[in-house]
Amino acid sequence: METMDNERRISTGIDGLDKAIDFLRPGDTVVWQCEHISDYMYVATRFVTNVARQGNRIVYIRFADHEEIMDTAALRERGANVEKYELDPRVGFETFAVQVHRIIDKETLGTFFVFDCLSDLQKYWFSDLMISNFFLLINPFLIRRQAVAYQPIDYEKHTYETISRIRKETPLLANIRTLDGSVYIHAVKVRGRSTPTTYFPLKITGTRWRTLTSSADTYAIFERFTQTSERRDCWDSMFDSVSDGREPTDEDGQRLKENILRCLLGNEPTRLALCRKYFSMRDLLYIKNREIGTGCVGGKAAGMLLARNILRDEAPELYRTRIEPHDSYYIGADVFYTYGVQNGLWSSRIRMVEAADYLEYAEPIRELLLNGIFMPSIKEQFLSMLEYFGQSPIIVRSSSILEDGFGNAFAGKYESVFCPNQGSLKERYDVFERAVKQVYASTVNPDAIKYRAERKLLDRDEQMALLVMRVCGDVHGNYYYPHIAGVGHSKNLYLNKQNASAENKGMLRLVFGMGTRAVDREADDYARLLNMDNPTAPPMVAYGDEYKYSQHKMDAIGLKDNEFETIRVDGIDKRDLKADPSLFMEPDYPTVSRLREMGLSTADAPNILNFRKLLRSTDFTDVMTEVMRVLEEKYSYPVDIEYACNFDQDGNYRVNLLQCRPLQTRGVGAAGVMPNVKEFYFRTSGNFMGGNVCLPIRYAVMVQVEPYLDLPEQRKY
């Protein structure tokens, strides 16, 4: 096991500084606050020269655009034990941080590290918060490896909050400036030791140095160091120059818009190309103004916004008259990483990525995610958002960076959580915070981890943003729900000879109430399945069985008990629907006929949720067909949507488009190849039940159809 003398004195290469801070020690990470990289090079060069002369191992972490801090080739020629690692921050925060961590871990105990300016990472991540997150992740590893590290930041490019987070964690923090031909160094934090002159400024002119202790000298220097102007986060600064919402006309403006597109909506190439066409600068500013924290809003949010903008531009009349507006909020992906860093789950996350049995670390990470705390500034923004929504029910939806992309949908892998949003502001906040943590924790559920592992995505940047939406619906007694909701595919994967057509207009799954019963299919209940080539065609069930194979339960938000509930639809027509019940249901006529034949009252005959009048008497199916057609055409790919609708007493309605993503028609693995077989036992054609597999068959069992059908239900199974 490697050990070191933690009290070993290490020179900075500057005598006056060594005297002021009582030298460096193993585990000291020094953050240099400077205005110009040349100031940092002054101290870094002297530090490297000194430790190289003593034969110490030196590692240079190179990632910035500024000039190189040290000439590793020249040092190596002089016999120095030096290594340069060139990294690209464009790979994303998580991947970049893991790369740096691996370098630190690989190097021997007590290695000396020199970093480029951390502030340059803003060019790639556009987030002040992520700069401090990176430091807070890497700093403990450096200390644990008893390294000595130099890391510069440009003091003027960071908010006070970022500087405060770094100051709190670094062992040493010092300012360095060049003024009037002299170098001034001022240590503002030295952990674990002090001398009578530690916190006095040091003036270096040529080879001479002196400590400035007189009030006149220190006033003159501190007055020039002091900055009273408010420091803007680089994220806010990026948007300040386009605050008027005008479209850019010059090359610099176009480049800035491209950066904003990538920062807000992600780098997935196919979707990004569509976003360039359908998002104006005004659209991007609107998203930014409704974002909590900073960073990408994630794939689900981007897909929803893109679909709405496509319809706005390509089908303006439909959009104006039939699409319900939304007022969603977005919790930026940077908040997820900040939450993880603040609550100490990073080490476990890295071990999970690198472990052979990655599920071993999932549960400990999940517990940390469920029981962490948020920064006060984030909590304040959460509260402000909840005040905006009032007591309208909301849903916290996962919107990870990779989610709903082309090739990796992550469908159903991450959670979404409904918040009934009733009670006092504190009660609503507590429920909302638990919902956020629950979605965060779903990033390490076994299904999600296996999905990422199968697609070799475990080491990819997968930050979790959140989409917070007002639930589409209305209050009906003690419950809140929309009249109808469901999912749609622009291509119908459930075809047979009878419903096949050359056009293939797609399909819808349709339910009464919350759309969860259409998304999360229930074994004991049924959604209405519509072939959009012939949407009014009755379900393919035997006469008299329509009620049996119809919807019997609905999902709703219980306002009285403040929870998501599943209730029976019996008697729903007698409740205050605020719409014509016959749009959605009609009497079960076979049952009515039987009751009449028996001379019994038909008053208690059940209704069937078959949506017959809705499908025959409104333009709902035409609208949904057009929505899916336009989106598929502009995506150049079949799409999968989620929707909900509310009706009024006159039959007017609007569609709330909740989600849009490329339709996943293939799983992992190679496509099957149909064999050219001339001799066969049996074959069939013309029917396709959606999804297919190619499996070796050992046995074929022939069942006599008529005797089988004569069996009672229990014997059949």
What are these regions (language model features)?
Residues 54-123:
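Conserved inter-motif catalytic segment of the P-loop NTP-binding fold
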Residues 2-6, 194-227:
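C-terminal regions of RecA-like/P-loop NTPase motor modules
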Residues 27-33, 57-59, 110-112, 148-150, ...:
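Residue-level preference for the first positions of well-ordered beta-strands
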Residues 9-65:
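Glycine-rich P-loop/Walker A and Walker A-like loops and their local beta1-loop-alpha1 context
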Residues 156, 272, 278-318, 372-717:
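Conserved mixed alpha/beta core segments that line enzyme active sites in large multi-domain catalysts
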Residues 147, 153-207:
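Phosphate-binding/switch region of NTP-binding enzymes
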Residues 124-125, 130-157:
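Substrate-engagement module of ASCE P-loop NTPases
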Residues 284-351, 355-376:
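A conserved helix-loop-beta module that forms one wall/lid of the active-site cleft
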